Amino acid sequence: MLTTMSASSNTNSLIEKEIDDEDMLSPIKSNNLVVRVNQDTDDNLQALFDSVLNPGDAKRPLQLPLRMRKLPNSFFTPPAPSHSRANSADSTYDAGSQSSINIGNKASIVQQPDGQSPIAAIPQLQIQPSPQHSRLAIHHSRARSSPASLQQNYNVRARSDAAAANNPNANPSSQQQPAGPTFPENSAQEFPSGAPASSAIDLDAMNTCMSQDIPMSMQTVHKKQRSYDVISPIQLNRQLGALPPGWEQAKTNDGQIYYLNHTTKSTQWEDPRIQYRQQQQILMAERIKQNDVLQTTKQTTTSTIANNLGPLPDGWEQAVTESGDLYFINHIDRTTSWNDPRMQSGLSVLDCPDNLVSSLQIEDNLCSNLFNDAQAIVNPPSSHKPDDLEWYKIN
């Protein structure tokens, strides 16, 4: 019996030892990483793209129609025609368009037959008649929400004051308003008493209606901005330079620049530097025009003289400089000359353009030589010259 118990105890100890050995080896086995590769990854990704690109091929569960869902009645009511994304303040300015529509607060209950549960009827719309005054169309777009539209309010108030001054039979309350184009403190004062303050009236339409009774001399055509450009003095000095002596630059209360001439004790809107530049441009244009006329006259005179003298000698060539002066080239001697080779007398000193003789002097010499040649042709010298002075007087 003892032998059996000892054998069983030895067996149990061996089993426990083996278990302990496995526990000691377990951390070593955990270092072995297992890599699993899913071969269907590309197919699954392609299936996702196909479900988006081809929605008809994908199997979608059936959805409940909108009418069968528990949605409020306002979900199926279309918006008002004047309510759009283009309006810059739909909830504020468009509230006046719905002011004439009132919804009944009390919902009528309809009793169903056969003991069914009562159903609340849809509230009916009660449309009230429009007010007596005719309302203008509302066209408040985003383009008019800029600060430049403040000038339109400025013009509207100015025209209303002018109309009240021209019409003595108008409402006295409107004539008690202070004259001058001031902005209203409350926007509700600009609208009729029957219309809500939140309703927006088209400013352009109001300007058109009011301008029909105002003369053309009082109408303002330039609405949205000033008719002058506000430029800093530093920028003007950089572009145009300093002011001439005796001039000073100043500004009005509105910021418009004007100029004072302390010499003549006068003021003007135009910049004297711009006026000086314009005068310089005019003078330059006149000088260029005069030079063109002079060059044309030179070329015409030179061509006329050349045609009367006949062709050039052999080896000579006629050319013109960049400034329009005429000179001659001798290809035989390889020299240049201002003198016409067809006229050999009186110009031997001016044989080279390096002498820098002005073209006007050359033309004067040419004209004097031509005049002498013409006189010799018309009045040939007589071989017998009498000593009597009367002959010289007659001839």
Curated annotation (Swiss-Prot):
Annotated consequence of substituting S227A: Increased activity and nuclear localization and decreased sensitivity to Hpo/Wts-mediated inhibition
Entry's Gene Ontology BP terms: apical protein localization; border follicle cell migration; cell competition in a multicellular organism; cell fate specification; cell population proliferation; epidermal cell fate specification; heart morphogenesis; hippo signaling
Residue span of region Disordered: 73-100, 129-150, 162-199
Main location: cytoplasm
Listed transmembrane segments: none
Record domain WW: where: 241-274, 310-343
Keyword Metal-binding: no
UniProt keyword terms in alphabetical order: Activator, Cytoplasm, Nucleus, Phosphoprotein, Proto-oncogene, Repeat, Transcription, Transcription regulation, Ubl conjugation
Gene Ontology CC annotations of this record: cell-cell junction; cytoplasm; cytosol; lateral cell cortex; nucleoplasm; nucleus; RNA polymerase II transcription regulator complex
Residue numbers carrying Phosphoserine: S82, S88, S100, S117, S145, S146, S149, S227, S232
Phosphotyrosine: residues bearing it: Y228
Family statement drawn from the similarity comment of this UniProt entry: Belongs to the YAP1 family.
Function: Transcriptional coactivator which is the critical downstream regulatory target in the Hippo/SWH (Sav/Wts/Hpo) signaling pathway that plays a pivotal role in organ size control and tumor suppression by restricting proliferation and promoting apoptosis. The core of this pathway is composed of a kinase cascade wherein Hippo (Hpo), in complex with its regulatory protein Salvador (Sav), phosphorylates and activates Warts (Wts) in complex with its regulatory protein Mats, which in turn phosphorylates and inactivates the Yorkie (Yki) oncoprotein.
Subunit-structure text: Interacts (via WW domains) with wts. Interacts (via N-terminus) with sd (via C-terminus) and this interaction enhances the transcriptional activity of sd. The phosphorylated form interacts with 14-3-3epsilon and 14-3-3zeta. Interacts with Ack and ex.
UniProt miscellaneous comment: Named for its loss-of-function phenotype after a very small breed of dog, the Yorkshire Terrier.
Name by which UniProt lists this protein: Transcriptional coactivator yorkie
Organism encoding this protein: Drosophila melanogaster
The gene coding this protein: yki
